[in-house]
């Protein structure tokens, strides 16, 4: 299964493959290698016409790669052979321990490629630091991963994060096992295609073997590869987590919302109020302006973002100024709307302006030495096709600027410093 000529699902044996076609393709692959005098591990690719059924004379040569390819684990899973070890044996001049006619296939294996990309926005590549990464461990399940938690996915290399390979007695069972594994996979930070892959494993046409290389493009909406409505339930959970883990932020937000310097909401005491009061303040959810309502009666905190729907399990991971959430395989990111206004409180910041997310600096609106006032716009960052203004947390003087317009910056990157009147204490 492929998208834009890039494979995303590989399996063995191929659905619809007959023994006659397998024999014909295998012999053609051997003939190609012999024709060029190649000795070593290699992968020969063919394309087959499926409209009238797969036939021994209905395939054509595409290319040969003189190496193992990404999908070799599905072959290993159904043959029980270690192709990498065999590759080393050939390179060392040894003979292979098994003849072709002795290779037997058992069961079915399916591999899914997890990419750092955004299916909801045209599969645009995604980059950034990996906030959380966890894969399930189960029988007949293999995970090959090339990154680590806290590692960074950059835009300079292939966005492949990992491969998950599931094996089972039948194709349907293998697809079910893979879909379940994808449901349990956690990738937070860069956007990923995990949820999309799970939907693909459950797609009726694919499960029935009724597909071709254009299947994904024809079924994008059904597979969840289209802009989705805001996940308000996850957003509410994120706001609750944001507030529960940062009482100082609660105090600053409450003070900003009420304009009451001595309001009991300003006390950093874990919402120890005797009576219920509702606070409304703006947040950013995936870059979208959202108004969250928070009510606390001294015992419990309730967060509402319009109709949040029924309660569901939400995985939440705090990373700096953001809460990354995963619900039903879909990632949401919750941040306070005015990052730097929050930092205006002495307890929350020292005038250092950092990038709230990965993006491109569109404009730097001040110069070193400029006098600025609290709330003044300092720079503009573009991320996910949206512009985000960075504002001064305090009155003061611009003492340092480390970026220029047009530069790509990572989340948390130091951009500039505002020195308060009298300097830092």
Positions of the model-derived regions?
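ATP-dependent carboxylate/phosphate-activation module, predominantly the ATP-grasp catalytic core
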Residues: 1-27, 68-83
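Short amphipathic alpha-helical segments
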Residues: 10-13, 22, 26-34, 88-89, 158-164, 349-351
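Catalytic cores of soluble metabolic enzymes centered on carboxylation/carboxyl-transfer
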Residues: 29, 52, 69, 73-300, ...
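Conserved metal-phosphate-binding beta-hairpin within the catalytic cores
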Residues: 38-69
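N-terminal accessory interaction module
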Residues: 295-319, 326
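Catalytic P-loop NTP-binding/switch module of NTPases
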Residues: 317-355
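Structured functional modules or segments
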Residues: 343-425
């Amino acid at each position: 299964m492929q998208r834009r000529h890039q494979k995303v699902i590989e399996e063995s044996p191929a659905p619809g493959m007959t023994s006659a076609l397998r024999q014909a393709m295998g012999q053609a692959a051997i003939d190609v290698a012999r024709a060029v005098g190649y000795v070593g591990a290699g992968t020969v690719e063919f394309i087959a016409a499926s409209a009238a059924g797969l036939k021994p004379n209905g395939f054509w040569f595409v290319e040969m790669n003189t190496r193992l390819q990404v999908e070799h684990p599905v072959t290993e899973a159904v043959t029980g052979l270690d192709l990498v070890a065999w590759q080393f044996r050939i390179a060392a001049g040894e003979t292979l321990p098994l003849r072709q006619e002795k290779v037997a296939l058992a069961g079915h294996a399916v591999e899914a490629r997890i990419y750092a990309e955004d299916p909801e926005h045209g599969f645009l590549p995604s980059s950034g630091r990996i906030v959380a990464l966890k894969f399930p461990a189960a029988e007949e399940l293999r995970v090959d991963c090339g990154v680590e938690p806290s590692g960074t996915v950059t835009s300079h290399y292939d966005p492949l994060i990992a491969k998950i390979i599931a094996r089972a007695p039948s194709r349907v069972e293998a697809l079910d096992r893979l879909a379940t594994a994808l449901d349990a996979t956690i990738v937070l930070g860069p956007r990923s295609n995990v949820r999309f892959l799970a939907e693909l494993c459950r797609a009726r046409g694919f499960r029935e073997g009724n597909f071709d290389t254009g299947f994904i493009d024809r079924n994008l909406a059904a597979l969840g590869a289209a802009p989705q409505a805001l996940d308000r339930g996850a957003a509410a959970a994120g706001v609750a987590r944001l507030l529960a883990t940062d009482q100082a932020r609660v105090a600053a937000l409450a003070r900003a919302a009420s304009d009451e310097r001595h309001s009991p909401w300003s006390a950093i005491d874990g919402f120890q109020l005797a009576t219920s009061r509702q606070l409304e303040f703006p947040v950013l959810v995936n870059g979208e302006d959202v108004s969250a309502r928070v009510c606390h009666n001294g015992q419990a905190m309730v967060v509402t973002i319009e109709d949040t729907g029924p309660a569901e399990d939400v995985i939440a991971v705090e990373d700096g100024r953001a809460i990354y959430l995963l619900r039903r395989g879909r990632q949401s990111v919750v941040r306070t709307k005015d990052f730097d206004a929050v930092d205006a409180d002495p307890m929350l910041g020292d005038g250092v302006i950092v990038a709230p997310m990965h993006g491109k600096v569109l404009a730097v609106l001040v110069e070193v030495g400029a006098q600025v006032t609290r709330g003044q716009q300092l720079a503009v960052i573009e991320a996910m096709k949206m512009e985000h203004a960075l504002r001064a947390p305090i009155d003061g003087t611009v003492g340092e600027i480390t970026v220029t317009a047009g530069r790509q910056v990572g989340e948390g990157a130091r951009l500039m410093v505002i020195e308060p009147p009298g300097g830092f204490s």
